[in-house]
């Protein structure tokens, strides 16, 4: 059963004031995972620009990639804002979909609890030395929390530990858990460190200043693709102009997120905050060094291939899904041209 929460991205007041063209807007079903890299979606849905452009967006939140892909493949979602790897895998299994825009690279960071943070501080932030020192001092491995296998933050963690930091595997223990569970475990000191997605990493450090940000995504796996916009083959065949319009709006919204986080924050808070996060915290998370905002698919192509290749090494799949035809560069460029850029 798909675990999702659906809401319409327009208020009743907005509907009553909408122009005639907007009232006959095309219904577009958009799925998303609740991460900061999807923020442009929340802006274009929340500020009314989508409806003004003739798109009536219905947003569906998915708490995991597999559930989102299941809905996407079943035909109940037209567009999906999610990590690139699940899209590539779905395509390799016969589902017709392409990436029509990038959204962000990175988006996560590794944070350490008090004891592990001290080990890093005492050892010049050298991962191998820090984890070895922690084990010597505590008499046990450092327990690290991260998302399930295959998730981008999890891939980034493994790459940082084994490829960048050359950490001894005997010094760490990795526990896979959900997005919100990692945050809760850090605050409860149930784990010694973990990979946290924004805005969780900003929130956790604000709530417990003893927790320290050790390394951001760029230092874990350079240019690692965070989030993309994928369209179903059926939607592209029947509504290609709408897909192009969406990409143009998404690009405009991305500029707002990158250049004016305070302006974007209320819309992102409405989608991600759940009433428990301050708007200022969201604004700081949007400006986090853990994330970069990018829309042009060609800018993430090489990093996507590197990501998928490393996932084979991790055992996430036997062979890397092909990226041939994965990115619809032509549609993206038409959208940019139509938007007058």
Annotated model-derived regions:
Residues 24-35, 55-60, 142-145, 174-175:
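Short, well-ordered beta-strand elements
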Residues 43-45, 109-120, 225-241:
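A bilobed periplasmic-binding-protein/Venus flytrap-type ligand-binding module shared by bacterial periplasmic
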